[in-house]
Amino acid sequence: MSCSWMIPVFAILAFVASAAQADVVEHTFNVATLSLPRICQPGNTSVTAVNGRVPGPQVEAREGDTVVIHVINDSPYNVTVHWHGVFQRGTPWADGPAMVTQCPIRPGHRYTYRFAVAGQEGTLWWHAHSSYMRATVYGALVIRPRRAGGYPFPTPYEEKTVLLGEWWNGDPVALESQSFSTGIPAPNADAYTINGMPGDSYLCPETTNRIAKFEVRRDKTYLLRIINAALNTAFFFKVAGHTFTVVAADASYTEPYATDVIVIAPGQTVDALMAADASPGCYHMAISSYQSAIPFPPRPAGFNGNTSTAIVEYVDATATTDAGSPVLPVMPKPNDTYTANQFYTSLTALIRPGRRTVPLTVDTRMLVTVGLGFSSCQPEQTQCNRSAPVVLANMNNVSFALPNTVSMLEALYRNTADGVYTRDFPDQPPVAFDYTSRGLLGNSPLASTGSPSTKVKTLRYNATVEMVLQNTALVGLESHPMHLHGFNFFVVAQGFGNNDGEAAGAGEFNLVNPQERNTVAVPTGGWAVIRFVADNPGMWAMHCHIDSHFAIGLAMVFEVESGPTPGTTLPPPPPDLPQC
């Protein structure tokens, strides 16, 4: 049986190790310009891609393997690659964020990323970490258990990688450059995608047969590795007629959680088991945006119901089965914060012997506001309207700016921080106020943000850190997916309203089995409390994974000092490290 109204065009992209027993996984990424058809517009557009594909190749390894990726930049842009969620213990130079751990790879140059995936299993991903290039430069990084091990859940019949993305009909890098120059936010994406394809909800000839397809067999169980690679959008994810059991988030195992809807913010991953137990036929897999912002924005034009689709097709149905049109799931409303909060707060960690547990004592406490504010045009914004304020993002009223002469990690290693960054990122906001009051929306003098600067928070090696991430209503309330490089953290509490560091007492904390993540969606008009141990020397960015916010300063960097032994000391840079 087949869904006769469409042509099967989807195939999972995968890279595998060169030999069955290899402990080194080695690949070459050729970064170059690729011409692809526009969506609901005639003609093609030029984008940057890896190995001629969007999404790029899937990298597969086992826990304990070493990954070696040779990146050759034949594009017209500077590029770096970030291995999202990889700890990079002993290899901080391979983390990838431009001007934090390395200078970019210039056009015509190359750089080799070498790192081990030790103590990690599950679904991670890789993406460009310079400008909006990650709109098309991204792919999956799957880390399976060692051969002697196995999953802490029933072995699935097959695994399916599901990469969620956004698509612009113009060059995303050029759009970001124009946005910075003018001080006007870049336009919304022209479409959402599943494995690079828009699906059948965009009713125009240009999308005919551009839909991903996942074939399943009845009564088999599948592991869906779901990755939100979108630049700016959180998604609701459903498959009509099917339910899920979530077993991992951000490559950390969870207690099994049954649900019919998955909520996934930019940067996050979810592993979910799906039983193919519906009547044989064709079913829509669908994503729709979770638009958390208050005031609630209008839906972007051209989004045809704000939903993109793929097909789940039963391949072992009888010939008499009605192929018909696929069933479409009922999606939550775009501003359904209740459903989002229900999902996020229902996940807990699966406790396993020998694995990390939440720290019970705290050395460093921080209350950090995350949100938007206003400032004046910067000198580099050559087309900015200097008679009106521009939007900047900030943490504790500090809008982050990347250095432009040397990477922060090089400055740390060579002890030349002066003129590159300062060690005065504040532990508290400059003024305490009613952070989430709707009365602040868009008209408070507290929204004034100073000029962007490069400030870090220095942490002693092995210090335990507790951060309260507090959303603010200045300019607008919105859920911010905050991603920490170099570490996982435990989400010990989250809620709505204000948390001044005392409001959520220890009695409200989950100090038994809190979910472990590398990216937390701070609730709209609320807060999240995270804990981690600073046991990884280096420069580690923490930033909003909404790229339109990161680009205007919603970021900071932790400078983690070296420990007492050679194995806990910042290593020297590799000989081929790119230079600015």
From Swiss-Prot:
One of its GO terms (cellular component) is apoplast. GO terms for molecular function: copper ion binding; hydroquinone:oxygen oxidoreductase activity; oxidoreductase activity. Glycans are attached at residues 44, 78, 306, 335, 385, 397, 462. Its main location: secreted. Residues 30-148, 158-317, 424-564 form the Plastocyanin-like domain. It is found in: Secreted, Extracellular space, Apoplast. Residues 1-22 form the signal peptide. It is an enzyme of class 1 (oxidoreductase). NCBIfam families: laccase. Lignin degradation and detoxification of lignin-derived products. Belongs to the multicopper oxidase family. This is Laccase-6. It comes from Oryza sativa subsp. japonica. The gene is LAC6.
